[in-house]
Design a protein with these regions (language model features):
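Nucleic-acid substrate recognition interfaces
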Residues: 1-136, 140
Length: 146
């Protein structure tokens, strides 16, 4: 039996600073995803072993960014969002190696659906609060019609 999930679409109206942070994070996620694909493709062409998402994340933070100071802007994005984009790239390669999908595509600005992980209740950026929706009881509801 399939489980049905209920979702609600809400419109957000971020401030200018929040829009800048969101755009930077989405751009960084796109760059890191493409960089992960390119790095593994280069390793494959050189006959080296495939780099998993975890080892790529360690290499990116401990070796690549310190040796390339022009790429320090990667650290400005949410770390969880960057890790999630690396995980997505790793999943794409894993599915490719299992012959479940084609070779992963590079993401292009404006043409690809880039996903981003939002940090919940980060006090520096925004605060998400839950709200309860109250509905009036239905006249046909047996629990409330007594």
């Amino acid at each position: 039996m399939r489980k049905l999930l209920k979702s609600f679409k809400t419109e957000i109206s971020p401030t200018i600073e929040q829009k800048i942070k969101i755009n930077k994070t989405i751009g960084t996620c796109r760059y890191v995803y493409n960089f992960y694909l390119d790095h593994n493709k280069t390793l494959y062409d050189n006959g080296e072993k495939f780099m998993t998402g975890k080892s790529f994340s360690v290499w990116l933070n401990n070796e690549y960014i310190p040796n390339n100071p022009d790429k320090i802007w990667i650290k400005e994005a949410y770390s969880k969002a960057v890790k999630k984009s690396i995980e997505d790239g790793c999943t794409a390669f894993t599915r490719f190696f299992k012959h479940q999908s084609a070779f992963p595509n590079f993401k292009k600005k404006g043409k690809s659906d880039v996903k981003m992980y939002f940090v919940k209740n980060n006090p520096k950026d925004c605060r998400c609060e839950s709200c309860l929706l109250y509905t009036s009881p239905s006249p046909r509801d047996p629990k409330t019609s007594r």
